[in-house]
Amino acid sequence: MINATDSKGTFYKLNQKEGIPIVFIHGVGLDHNIWDPQINEFDNTVLIYDILGHGRTPLNKEKISFDDFSDQIIDLIDELKFDKIHLVGFSIGSLIARNFGTKFSDRLKA
């Protein structure tokens, strides 16, 4: 299990295994810890992280959009050198996932 912060300040946990990575997005007022029970339950690599302004990831601007959240994911998966991902979202995380799919559909497996 890797606990780290990427070059843009996003805190994440990574359980490196095989297959296409599964990325979990938490909801408002929560952080990556909501997904702790899932991180070891998959044969695939699992990535959990703190969305902007939550947990250990700072918010460095006054206004934020769904595009900012989607850009956060693309920056993180690019840095980790993930080509395609599976994306799972809860609450606002599902809206972020929908936005990500609109902007970066070529990076989604499911």
List the model feature ranges, each with a label:
Residues A4-N15:
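A short loop-to-beta-strand scaffold at the N-terminal edge of the catalytic core in hydrolase folds
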Residues P37, L47-V88:
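Active-site loop/oxyanion-hole signature of alpha/beta-hydrolase fold enzymes
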Residues L14-P58:
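Conserved HGGG/HGGXW glycine-rich cap/lid loop of the alpha/beta-hydrolase fold
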Residues F11, I34-P37, E41, D68-D75, ...:
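Alpha-helical elements of Rossmann-like donor-binding domains used by nucleotide-donor carbohydrate transfer enzymes
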